[in-house]
Amino acid sequence: IAGKTEAEKYLVQSILAKNGSYLVIDPEGILEGQTSEKLKQEGYHVYICNVDDTKGFFYDYFRYYYYNIFHNEKTVLYLTGSDKIRNEKLIAEITLILDDILNGKMDLSQHLTLMVNDFGHLAGGINFPHKLSRIKGTQVSAILCTESLLPLQTEHYNPMLTDEILDSCNVITEK
């Protein structure tokens, strides 16, 4: 996929395909704006969390408000908030949430797709991509759309992205 517009179209189509539930990390709220109403009309439980409005430890906030929502079929949670969501501390907390999902601590009665839309600071030393290597054999899949995950290009090389991780994810890169 050549650019941001094409990547976002792909992500919108993937969400509207309605395959299970979705956790969508969407800093600018672009995917939420294009899909949430359509999903509501299709009977989805739609939750929108603007992380800029949360206080304290986001992991605790998530556990209190959203931890058990994915046991319902047809659920989508959008995490938006362009300022705070790109913070390394918050990325680390989202990594803990992903850990809980992959370790079976959250009740997933159906397939969950994790989508990351343009998460520009993802690669900065956080082990979030490493967690995705454990995705095979779970009810979770991932679609990543971010320039920081450009696979193995010299000026953009990210040593945390092994072939195993890239093979387990559908990676869309901007050029």
Task: Label every PLM stretch briefly.
Residues 1-144, 149-157, 161-170:
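P-loop NTPase motor domains
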